[in-house]
Amino acid sequence: MLQNQDTMEILSNSTSKFPTFLLTGIPGLESAHVWISIPFCCFYAIALSGNSVILFVIITQQSLHEPMYYFLFRLSATDLGLTVSSLSTTLGILWFEAREISLYSCIVQMFFLHGFTFMESGVLVATAFDRYVAICDPLRYTTILTNSRIIQMGLLMITRAIVLILPLLLLLKPLYFCRMNALSHSYCYHPDVIQLACSDIRANSICGLIDLILTTGIDTPCIVLSYILIIHSVLRIASPEEWHKVFSTCVSHVGAVAFFYIHMLSLSLVYRYGRSAPRVVHSVMANVYLLLPPVLNPIIDSVKTKQIRKAMLSLLLTK
């Protein structure tokens, strides 16, 4: 009896149901965090301003109230959400060494981070469908992609994200966490958080894998299929001008898909199979995964999308 009591005391002293986690900046470069914050601030400023400008341009310019730009609007909105979700914790660490975060704050951050990630995956699929219809069936474009159907697609993206993220977070509630509670990077990432649990995390890992399959595992083949059909259709076009037009139409979306899925899959694989990798690898990949798409997407969209570029110029000239 006494031995069992001692065991329970040791367990209670080494675990916690409501822990405080310690976020990590760039491991090994803590003394240079203030200097490292300069490029981070630049990236955040580009992501926030670039996506905000695209949202403003699409809202204010009547000529951009078309399906293609509605999807671009949603992409910028999700990129903005991803940026804001990690902004406070990342800069808090780099500027003030504010590393502590409670479990509940961590859950809230994961809700928005993973939720916006799932939504962005859905937006990329919807945009691929938009490009497929525009190129392969242009005569029926306006009848297929009506405003009501676009709204339904948007609601479906949000619903899917919420349905996928809630079980993932609810399964964290029964877990006990070890006192060694340092996370690998500057925000709460679900695979990183569950690795600190002293409880059985098989259900959490399975749920995370199911979410990955239901997003990346389904969305990526759908996007690939849409572009296979687009390429098959374009191969029958003899005019170089038409080839160039199709390429210009699709290049920004292909770039967004590449930035998003390559880094998401790389980060997932590192957490599942690269546990021996240095901590700095986890940290750098995690920050690149969140920052690169929101920074590059508005730049590519404004450069490669002629109508967006014209709308921006008209706004600047009128002022």
UniProtKB/Swiss-Prot annotation:
Residues 1-37, 97-106, 171-211, 271-279 are extracellular. InterPro entries: GPCR_Rhodpsn (IPR000276), GPCR_Rhodpsn_7TM (IPR017452), Olfact_rcpt (IPR000725), OR51/52/56-like (IPR050402). Pfam families: 7tm_4 (PF13853). It is a multi-pass membrane protein. Disulfide bonds join C106-C188. It is found in: Cell membrane. One of its GO terms (molecular function) is G protein-coupled receptor activity. GO terms for cellular component: plasma membrane. Keywords: Cell membrane, Disulfide bond, G-protein coupled receptor, Membrane, Olfaction, Receptor, Sensory transduction, Transducer, Transmembrane, Transmembrane helix. The keyword Nucleotide-binding does not apply. SUPFAM superfamilies: Family A G protein-coupled receptor-like. Its main location: membrane. The chain crosses the membrane at residues 38-58, 76-96, 107-127, 150-170, 212-232, 250-270, 280-300. Residues 59-75, 128-149, 233-249, 301-319 are cytoplasmic. The keyword Membrane applies. Belongs to the G-protein coupled receptor 1 family. Odorant receptor. This is Olfactory receptor 51F1. It comes from Homo sapiens (Human). The lineage of its organism: Eukaryota, Metazoa, Chordata, Craniata, Vertebrata.
